[in-house]
Amino acid sequence: MVSVTRRSLLLGVGTSAAAAAALALGGCSLGQAPTRIRMACGEQGGTYVQFGELLRDALTRAGTTGLEVVTTGGSVANLELLKHRDAELAIVLADAAATDAQNKVAIGRVYQNYLQCFVRRGGPIGGLEDFPGRRISIGAPQSGAALTARRVLTALGLLDGADAVEVSELYLDEAMTALETNAVDAIFWSGGLPLPAVQSLETEVELVDLTSALPALEVDHPGMYTLAAVPASTYGSAESVRAIGVSNYLLARPDLPDDVAEALVDVLIGDAAQLVPEGSLGVQYLTASNLIDTSPIALHPAAQRRYRQLYG
């Protein structure tokens, strides 16, 4: 058996070495379904890891496929791990996935992300009109949040010229500390509701409505973003806050074994209630009619067949 460290997997290994690593982790031989697969998720404290852990537990209960949850910077990093065979599954924002629809397939659309912009309550930012010149963390390096945030800031005219903001890319724990210590004035996060890490902050925060960017986003990225809302109860606001929504896809490599793809579909549908984090307020897509909507990424053929077998 080949021994492969997590560090070598995340730094990237050659195709042949990565293939050997996958076999070693799975404890299988060529042509057989792996008994263990890796899923590239996101940062600790975020929704991606929560979902990955719930999916892992559901697969364990089903006795089909073991799942290793791999923490990463987010969607863009996850695509790289999938591309280089350092993960068999990845959860990825639809806008990040659509930048290159090749060499990947979808198992399903699983839930909606909300692009959230947190500022200190009573701080220097009360709305978008206060953004010019401010220090803003747009998300972790190689995260989907950073990709979406850059698109939003571009649409709002806040990345260039006299109104440009000062952009940094901070990991979640760094961003939270920076917000509390006034090192940044706002932080972006893309995830489900609520963001668990916010609930442990000593500093009171509030959300900024970013939805005035939607018309320009629709022109540049048609059909990718939707108008959503963060309920008032989420972070203690007196009213709901409008937000920008974007779907999440559970992606795989095209050579993911058919029986693994089928097992994943069975769990996504049969264990849907157990795949929603406790206290989650966001929109879930864990029904057959919603799971199959993964455009422009094609469904894994075996997953598509399984959806048809179950629901026609």
Spans of model-derived segments:
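Bacterial signal peptide processing site
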Residues: 29-31
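A structural signal for short loop-to-beta-strand junctions that line the ligand-binding cleft
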Residues: 102-110, 136-137, 233-242
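Extracytoplasmic
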Residues: 34, 64, 77, 102, ...
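Segments of small-molecule ligand-sensing domains
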Residues: 241-312
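Pocket-flanking alpha-helical
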Residues: 52, 68-105, 173-179, 193-201
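Pocket-lining segment of extracytoplasmic ligand-binding domains
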Residues: 94-97, 160-251, 255-256
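N-terminal export signals
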Residues: 2, 8-27
